[in-house]
């Protein structure tokens, strides 16, 4: 009788302990506490990065929005308002996100990343750089033949008249047209928040851990019931 009572007390204590542990695990793994714990931190104000250099801000490409030629409505993520006709905006070189010029310039006074996806705005190499790649083609006049006669004087191929020594002309050809820029803007419009995917991973991991804890509880309860029946049968 004493052995049975002790086994029952042990079973009750173990079940209560497992129940308390399971509740603690659920509270610890909840998204609310996870967000609160992740957002509670302290930073040194002296180590906080400053804004972008004004020369880098001016080098970012600018476009003029047109409601007639635009394929879709564009929205500035800083002021949360849509672009209107003939409004100027800036395109981020890495992520291709678009913002109002005055909104993003004010943002870059104290930040150095995109306000939407947090990608760093890297300075252009070699100073200010155009948003479109350009190809320079040099065209020069052909050199005259081996011998030339000018006013009755014979000249060899080494001496070339001054009129023929002209500077080469450079023609700049843009490699990107307006259609490619609109395609880049359309891809940036379908931007997905980077916090969506980690949430899905967290929920799947949480469900798998919950299943493991429940399975452990069932196995322990079956084992304790087996021990209890064994002790009763021995009597």
UniProtKB/Swiss-Prot annotation:
Residues 143-167 are annotated as: Disordered. Induction: Up-regulated by chitin. Keywords: Membrane, Metal-binding, Plant defense, Transferase, Transmembrane, Transmembrane helix, Ubl conjugation pathway, Zinc, Zinc-finger. InterPro entries: ATL1/ATL16-like (IPR044600), Znf_RING (IPR001841), Znf_RING/FYVE/PHD (IPR013083). The RING-type zinc finger domain mediates binding to an E2 ubiquitin-conjugating enzyme. It is found in: Membrane. It comes from Arabidopsis thaliana (Mouse-ear cress). It is a single-pass membrane protein. A zinc finger (RING-type) spans 76-118. GO terms for biological process: defense response; protein ubiquitination. Its EC number is 2.3.2.27. This is RING-H2 finger protein ATL17. It catalyses: S-ubiquitinyl-[E2 ubiquitin-conjugating enzyme]-L-cysteine + [acceptor protein]-L-lysine = [E2 ubiquitin-conjugating enzyme]-L-cysteine + N(6)-ubiquitinyl-[acceptor protein]-L-lysine. Pathway: Protein modification; protein ubiquitination. GO terms for cellular component: membrane. The keyword Transmembrane helix applies. It is an enzyme of class 2 (transferase). PANTHER family: RING-H2 FINGER PROTEIN ATL16 (PTHR46913:SF1). May be involved in the early steps of the plant defense signaling pathway. Signal peptide: none annotated. Pfam families: zf-RING_2 (PF13639). Belongs to the RING-type zinc finger family. ATL subfamily. The chain crosses the membrane at residues 1-21. GO terms for molecular function: transferase activity; zinc ion binding. Its main location: membrane.
């Amino acid at each position: 009788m004493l052995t049975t009572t002790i086994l029952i007390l042990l079973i009750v204590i173990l079940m209560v302990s497992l129940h308390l542990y399971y509740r603690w695990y659920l509270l610890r793994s909840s998204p609310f506490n996870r967000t609160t714990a992740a957002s509670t931190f302290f930073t040194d104000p002296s180590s906080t990065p400053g804004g972008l250099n004004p020369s880098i801000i001016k080098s970012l490409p600018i476009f003029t929005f047109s409601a007639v030629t635009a394929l879709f409505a564009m929205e500035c993520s800083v002021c949360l308002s849509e672009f209107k006709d003939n409004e100027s905006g800036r395109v981020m070189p890495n992520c291709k996100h678009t913002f109002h010029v005055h909104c993003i310039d004010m943002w870059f006074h104290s930040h150095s990343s995109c306000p939407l996806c947090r990608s760093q705005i890297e300075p252009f190499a070699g100073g200010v750089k155009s948003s479109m790649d350009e190809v320079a083609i040099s065209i020069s006049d052909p050199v005259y033949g081996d011998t030339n006669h000018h006013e009755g004087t014979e000249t060899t191929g080494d001496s070339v008249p001054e009129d023929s020594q002209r500077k080469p002309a450079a023609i700049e050809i843009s490699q990107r047209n307006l259609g490619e820029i609109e395609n880049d803007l359309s891809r940036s419009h379908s931007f997905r928040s980077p916090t969506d995917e980690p949430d899905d991973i967290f929920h799947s991991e949480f469900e798998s851990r919950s299943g493991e804890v429940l399975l452990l509880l069932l196995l322990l309860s079956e084992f304790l019931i087996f021990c209890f029946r064994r002790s009763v049968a021995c009597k």
